[in-house]
Amino acid sequence: MFWIFVMAKPASLSIELDSDLDRRLSEIAEGMDQPKTAIIERALRDFVELRDWQDAAIDEGLRAAEEGRVFDHDKVGEWIDSWGTPNERPMPSRD
C-alpha cells in the first residue's frame, strides 16, 4: 500500500509595505534565518487562527447568554472588588 498526497498550489499575493515595516520585517527575517515570505505567511496564519478562535469564543458566549448560562454582572463585580480584602467573597453562583 502507498499513499499519494496532493499539495494545494500556493496562492500568490502582492502587498505594499511602508519602508519602516519592510525594514523591520527584513531584520526579523534575517534574525530568524527565514525568508520574508515565510515570516509574512506565519503572521497571516496566526492572525487567521486567532480570528477563528475569537469568532468561536464570541459564538459560545452568545449561546451561553441565550441559554441563561451567565453570571449577574453586579455580583461578579462585588466578588472581584472583595479580592485581597479581609472579607473576600466566594465566587457567585449562576442564578
UniProtKB/Swiss-Prot annotation:
Phosphoprotein recorded as keyword: no
Gene Ontology biological process terms, A to Z: regulation of DNA-templated transcription; SOS response
CDD domains for this protein: RHH_CopAso-like (cd22233)
Top-level taxonomic group: Bacteria
Keywords: Toxin-antitoxin system
InterPro entries according to UniProt: CopG, Non-func_TypeII_TA_Antitoxin
Disruption outcome: No visible phenotype; its associated toxin gene (parE2, not annotated in UniProtKB) is non-functional.
Function: Antitoxin component of a non-functional type II toxin-antitoxin (TA system). Does not neutralize the effect of any of the RelE or ParE toxins.
Protein name listed in UniProt: Orphan antitoxin ParD2
Annotated organism of origin: Caulobacter vibrioides (strain ATCC 19089 / CIP 103742 / CB 15) (Caulobacter crescentus)
Gene name for this UniProt entry: parD2
